[in-house]
């Protein structure tokens, strides 16, 4: 299922980040490394997100009640595909080249 509005507000996402309530998938870390981003660089990209970077929201394949916000920000290396999911007040990040 998809929709055109984000279920998670950017201010909530950024607050979770600032509180250290964030983790990343292994594939996100590998994708970031391929783009020469370390984890701190990924977090900096998230902190710089604006509403205009939003692309879509979709549910996870495993659970259609869990929503993922997809952003496509432009970085120094080009546009990236960034999925953000909040589960139990923890931000989960997926990051790869678009």
Task: Indicate residue ranges for each PLM-predicted region.
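Ribonuclease/tRNase effector modules and their secretory precursors
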Residues: 1-98
